[in-house]
Amino acid sequence: MTLVESIDSLQAWFDEHVCQQATFKVPTDNNITGEAQLIHPASFALYVPARDRIPPNVVAPIPSICIQLMEGEDKLTERNTRLNIRLCLAVWNPGDQTGVDFTPVPDPSNPVGVKYTQGDDKPTYTRNLDGWRDIMNFVDLVRLELRKHDIIAGHRIVKEEPIKFGQFFQDDALWDSYPYWHSWITFSVEYGGMIALSKECESLL
């Protein structure tokens, strides 16, 4: 398995097993007081693109989960490869917005294709700092899925070592990017693969 195949398959796995289970608010920085809309998080490999560079099938770069390869090693005698993975999670939540509902209502005029409403014709907004709860719930969902599975996308989760998680810091201070909320998770996976024999070894066979 090549590194590209590994990263692609891991991204697809998290998209199916994590992203499709969660919904978070779509960032509307220019109209925070409006009705909130919910979408499944997007999944990205290595980098989160800027808003003007997202793929056509992605509504917004956040909410999202980004699968990053931090380090790898080939264990030549054991004929397997180990990858150290970091997941970067991000959500947006400026506070309470009326109209948030997990029951979608079709709306062709909306870029998401649906809207979420509680029937309030006059959306209101109350700023708060509870968005951290969304990112912690996102982290918990990923942790749960990693605990439930031993093999993901053909890779064995190295459960002999802990899954680590936390928040980002800058200059020893918690990274404050309100109304955006971020967190990370690290873990390792392994997979076996055929290792090409050197000419010296082939001559001995």
Task: For each feature predicted by the language model, list its residue ranges.
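Small/polar-rich, solvent-exposed N-terminal microdomains that initiate assembly or binding
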Residues: 1-79, 200-205
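Short, well-structured alpha-helical interface segments that form or flank functional binding sites
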Residues: 5, 62, 82, 133, ...
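Solvent-exposed amphipathic alpha-helical surface segments
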Residues: 17-25, 149, 153, 194
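Intrinsically disordered, low-complexity acidic Ser/Thr-rich regulatory segments
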Residues: 53-59, 121-130
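Oligomerization/assembly interface segments of phage tail-like spikes and tubes
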Residues: 79-96, 104-124, 142, 177-193
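Glycine-rich, small/acidic residue-mixed loop/short-helix segments
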Residues: 99
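Acidic-leaning, charged glycine-interspersed low-complexity segments
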Residues: 126-192
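A hydrophobic membrane-anchoring alpha-helix module
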Residues: 188-198, 204-205
